[in-house]
Regions:
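Glycine-rich phosphate/diphosphate-binding loop of Rossmann-like nucleotide-binding domains
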Residues: 138-216
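Rossmann-like adenosine-cofactor binding region
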Residues: 198-272
Length: 361
């Protein structure tokens, strides 16, 4: 039996209301102070993971810091807390531990965490990129578009997920715009992309102007607040929001019935899996970052796989191959905890066609 663990944390104080309704009545500052003092702990035992080649069990480990705390508290304190989580996983018998959300971003993106543990560590970012591109391509096709005629925008293009996504998307689209707060790393990446691909490449730190012309948007920033609003997008745009917390405001889906918003990396996993914890997904599905940890465990690949600020495209392709081998698949589309059906996508397409016919843009 292979063994793995996965570290996760509340994205915001509001997430704690799912644990206890009384949290709704307590000040955020009080809850954050309590979370800072609380030690990591085992949340649940994961059973039933089984592919044609192997079986595995695992554990969820709770890191009691919100996303805001992870970027505002001293880096050393946060990294030490994540290492504590990893040591719990180690004591439980896990041979690889996965990082989620901001635990994979803080500090040097998992490298120091791995150095302080005796088990393998992965961020899950390689499979996150693979499935985000796969899902975006499929959704775009259902919307009646071909990637090779599309203008794509990657928001957060200088990060590990963003830059890897750029490298893969650039091989498929007509034009790609890289967006981030700091231009120098974008310009360096753009030069690399231009040398290796035939698509047109642009860079900018002006997100709204870039989005207005985008057929495809892949957004992967570590922003704590929404950065994409309803007025930013053109009719027919396909937006894949990989970020946690989300980059795309809920108002986009509520106010723009001519724009398709999907979440990146929702995966169907093999076996009859019981997470013994409700994180809002249907049975036998998970985030792609979680799935990467499971795939590596089933394969017996107990090595540091996706760490640091740069992702290897060869590893993205490799984890995709291993996912296919162990029967991990894209589980359709979701947005704000709801399924996005093909019928809904076709309705968005009709609304976009009508909007373009009426307004001509």
């Amino acid at each position: 039996m292979e063994k793995f663990a996965f570290i996760f944390h509340p994205l915001s104080v509001q997430d704690m209301e799912h644990v206890s309704p009384i949290m709704h009545y307590l000040p955020d500052s009080f809850i954050e102070a309590c979370l800072k003092m609380k030690k990591p702990f085992k949340v649940s035992h994961i059973t039933g993971l089984k592919s044609p080649y192997a079986e595995a069990e695992g554990w969820f480990i709770g890191c009691t810091l919100t996303a805001k705390q992870m970027v505002t508290l001293p880096e050393e304190f946060v990294v030490d807390r994540i290492v504590e989580c990893g040591k719990i996983a180690q004591e439980l018998g896990a041979k690889i531990v996965g990082l989620s959300a901001f635990t994979s971003i803080v500090g040097d993106a998992g490298i120091t965490v791995a150095k302080n543990l005796d088990i393998a560590v992965t961020s899950g970012n390689s499979y996150t990129v693979a499935t985000a591109i796969q899902g975006t391509e499929l959704a775009t096709k259902i919307m009646g578009k071909s990637l090779d005629s599309c203008r794509a925008v990657v928001v957060g293009a200088s990060g590990s997920i963003g830059s890897a996504s750029v490298r893969l998307l650039a091989k498929k689209v007509k034009h790609i715009t890289l967006v981030a707060r700091h231009l120098p790393p974008l310009e360096e990446l753009a030069q690399e992309i231009s040398r290796e691909n035939s698509c047109e490449v642009a860079v900018t730190d002006k997100i709204s102007s870039a989005l207005r012309e985008a057929d495809i948007v892949l957004t992967v920033t570590s922003a704590l607040d929404f950065i994409i609003s309803p007025s930013d997008l053109k009719p027919g745009a396909v937006v894949c929001d990989v970020a946690r917390p989300r980059n795309v405001s809920r108002e986009v889906s509520l106010m723009r019935n001519d724009v398709l918003v999907i979440e990146g990396g929702v995966i169907s996993i093999p076996g009859d899996v019981n997470f013994n914890f409700d994180f809002g997904f249907p049975k036998n599905t998970s985030y792609a970052c979680m799935a990467e940890t499971m795939i590596l465990a089933l394969e017996g690949r107990y090595e540091n796989f996706s760490l640091g600020r740069s992702l290897d495209v060869a590893k993205i392709n490799e984890i995709s191959r291993l996912a296919d081998k162990h029967n991990f698949k894209l589980a359709g589309f979701r947005n704000f905890e709801r399924a996005v059906t093909e019928a809904h996508i076709l309705e968005v397409k009709r609304n976009a066609d009508l909007s373009l016919a009426v307004h001509g843009k």
